[in-house]
């Protein structure tokens, strides 16, 4: 639980959305960066280069580049991307 392993935000590329279109950024969502991890409340923002920024309500442990971030709206999986 070292403080340097805590991240309050991440960037993600290679985005893929189940509905085929990105979800609107102005809504609250939850995200996971690890399998079986508890859903973490977050907000998203899209960057001009097509990537996404995810800002968590509380810092997340050991966010790792190259792994996936998966976005949810309640119980519905929206898609996600690769952490950069």
Predicted regions, residues:
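AMP-forming adenylation/ATP pyrophosphatase catalytic core
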Residues: 1-84
């Amino acid at each position: 639980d070292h403080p340097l392993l805590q991240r309050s935000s991440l960037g993600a590329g290679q985005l893929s959305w189940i509905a085929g279109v990105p979800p609107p950024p102005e809504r609250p969502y939850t995200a996971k960066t690890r399998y079986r991890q508890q859903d973490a409340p977050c907000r998203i923002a899209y960057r001009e280069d097509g990537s996404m920024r995810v800002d968590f309500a509380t810092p997340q442990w050991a966010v790792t580049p190259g792994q996936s971030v998966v976005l949810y709206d309640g119980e519905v999986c929206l898609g996600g991307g690769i952490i950069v």
